[in-house]
Design a protein with these regions (language model features):
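Active-site nucleophile loop of the alpha/beta-hydrolase fold
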Residues: 2, 32-35, 90-100
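Short beta-strand/loop motif that positions the catalytic acidic residue
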Residues: 126-127, 131-134
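Active-site catalytic motif of lipid deacylating hydrolases and related acyltransferases
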Residues: 1-60, 164
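Gly/Ala-rich beta-loop-alpha elbow adjacent to hydrolase catalytic centers
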Residues: 65-75
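Conserved hydrolase catalytic core segment
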Residues: 76-89, 98
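Conserved alpha/beta-hydrolase "acid-adjacent" motif
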Residues: 139-144
Length: 192
């Protein structure tokens, strides 16, 4: 999850975690420390620990769903080789524009360098399948999600009117996400 997120009731991530657990899936949905003033090393450490625990569940598909600043956290994890085993699928939802995160008060660390030539190879090393999705009206992506296409060498999906996929943007249940978990078809993510 992202900056200032405390896993609120009604948020699509929390609702999806509950739905998937009810269906019998193993779900990790940790609260990252200090969401108002995230410290990159602490977020990376928790991401590493949670990923390693996922590796302890044999025979299960390993899927990461990251939102907002959580997408930046996952990409830094991939760049830093903090994972033990690759993810079968990674979904980056509403990745923020690094220019915006660098200007936001309370977000520590260097902004993601989208020109880093290692970004795409490292992301592909740790994600067997990588999907990026964003809204066409995301306040955290004033230049549009297209800035991630050359950086990650993947064409992002655009969901019209999705905003930042937040409660403020009217995001609650996301049936398409549950469908994608089951099918693996990125097109399912466009279902609201």
């Amino acid at each position: 999850h992202g900056w200032t997120n405390r896993r609120p009731e009604g948020h699509w991530m929390r609702l999806s975690a509950a739905t998937l657990r009810a269906q019998g899936h193993h779900v990790w949905y940790p609260q990252f420390p200090d969401p108002d003033t995230p410290k990159p090393l602490e977020w990376q450490d928790l991401l590493r620990q949670e990923s390693n625990m996922m590796d302890e569940v044999p025979g299960e598909e390993k899927i990461c769903i990251a939102h907002s600043l959580g997408t930046t956290n996952w990409l830094y994890g991939a760049l830093g080789d903090i994972f033990t085993e690759p993810f079968d699928r990674v979904l980056l939802v509403a990745p923020p524009d690094p220019q915006m995160t660098s200007e936001a008060e309370g977000i520590e660390g260097e902004p993601m360098d989208l020109s880093n030539p290692l970004l795409a190879p490292q992301a592909k090393k740790w994600a067997k399948s990588l999907t990026v999705i964003a809204g066409d009206n995301d306040r955290w992506l004033p230049r549009g999600v297209g800035i991630y296409e050359p950086a990650l060498e993947t064409e992002p999906l655009i969901l019209p009117g999705a905003g930042h996929f937040s409660l403020d943007d009217g995001w609650g249940r996301w049936p398409g996400l549950i469908s994608w978990i089951e099918s693996g078809d990125p097109g399912d993510l466009l279902e609201r």
